[in-house]
């Protein structure tokens, strides 16, 4: 077990390392749960470099839950083309339709986890990044 001074030192070193080595990614510049959710779904089984090319274009076309929920499937899939795994886009639209009916994005890990196509990793990422909830984002 680490002592409190050791924990503080480790924390300080990790934050220093991150400040030097972090990547400037567009989805790290927002706390909007919708935008973070879109990025996390796009990043499932897809390289970061590929997602960067699609993320902002996708959000320009579907800037909010309502626009994604109401989009014709052909339009959605055309904007997803190139990312592969089209079931992700279809699940995203189903989730957007559910959220649109409720009127707000779920603000808890459990609520996010219940959305179609959302697993533990994505739910933890959205909960921790968008809502500052203490959920570890563990890839496995």
Stretch-by-stretch model annotation:
Residues 2-8, 12, 16-140:
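Catalytic cores of DNA base-excision repair glycosylases
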């Amino acid at each position: 077990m680490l002592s409190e001074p050791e924990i503080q030192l480790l924390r300080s070193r990790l934050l220093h390392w991150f400040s030097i080595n972090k990547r400037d990614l567009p989805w790290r510049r927002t706390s909007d749960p919708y935008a973070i959710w879109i990025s996390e779904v796009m990043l499932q089984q897809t390289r970061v470099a590929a997602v960067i090319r699609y993320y902002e274009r996708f959000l320009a076309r579907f800037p909010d839950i309502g626009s994604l929920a109401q989009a014709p499937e052909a339009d959605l899939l055309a904007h997803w083309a190139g990312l592969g795994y089209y079931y992700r886009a279809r699940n995203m639209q189903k989730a957007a339709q559910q959220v649109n009916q409720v009127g707000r994005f779920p603000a808890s890990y459990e609520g996010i986890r219940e959305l179609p196509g959302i697993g533990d990793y994505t739910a933890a990422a959205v909960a921790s990044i968008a809502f500052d909830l203490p959920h570890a984002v563990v890839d496995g």
